[in-house]
């Protein structure tokens, strides 16, 4: 525990919170161009081919983003909107593509949780 004199000299340092999505630089989303679209395998107990893309953001940083939902139309040079949000079983993937925005099409035949995948309400 510091003495009063030490507190007078130095004071208390405020705790600095580290951001979980540094490439967005405090913005909710960022636009970027896909430089590579590929699949990866997840960490140990899980098994799948997760769809990911390497994206160069408009602020110059290059990040790996996850493409959520079943099926996608992304390829090299596609322009995508990137949001924060990690994928627990893919190490180093801290961002996701916003479906239904820019070049990323919405998920087809989506009935539930539609807003997350950019799917419009189906007509009766």
From Swiss-Prot:
Give any GO molecular function from the UniProt entry. tRNA binding
Compositionally biased intervals (Polar residues): 27-42
- List every stretch annotated Disordered: 1-42
Q: What's a GO biological-process term for it? A: translation
Q: Where in this protein does the record say 3-methylthioaspartic acid is found?
A: 89
Point to the regions of Basic residues compositional bias: 9-18
User: Which InterPro entries does the entry mention?
Assistant: NA-bd_OB-fold, Ribosomal_uS12, Ribosomal_uS12_bac
Keyword tRNA-binding on entry: yes
Provide the assembly information: Part of the 30S ribosomal subunit. Contacts proteins S8 and S17. May interact with IF1 in the 30S initiation complex.
Q: What does this protein do?
A: With S4 and S5 plays an important role in translational accuracy.
Which protein family is it in?
A: Belongs to the universal ribosomal protein uS12 family.
Write the protein's name: Small ribosomal subunit protein uS12
**Gene that codes for this?**
rpsL
């Amino acid at each position: 525990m510091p003495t009063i004199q030490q507190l007078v000299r130095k004071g208390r340092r405020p705790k600095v919170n580290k951001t979980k999505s540094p490439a967005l630089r405090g913005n909710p989303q960022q636009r970027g161009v896909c430089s590579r679209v590929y699949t990866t395998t997840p960490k140990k107990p899980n098994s799948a081919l997760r769809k990911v893309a390497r994206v160069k953001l408009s602020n110059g940083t290059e990040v790996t983003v996850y493409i959520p939902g079943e099926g996608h139309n992304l390829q090299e040079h596609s322009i995508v909107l990137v949001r924060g949000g990690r994928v627990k079983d893919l190490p180093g993937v801290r961002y996701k593509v916003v479906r239904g925005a820019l070049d990323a099409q919405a998920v087809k035949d989506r009935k539930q949780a539609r807003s997350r995948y950019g799917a419009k309400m189906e007509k009766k």
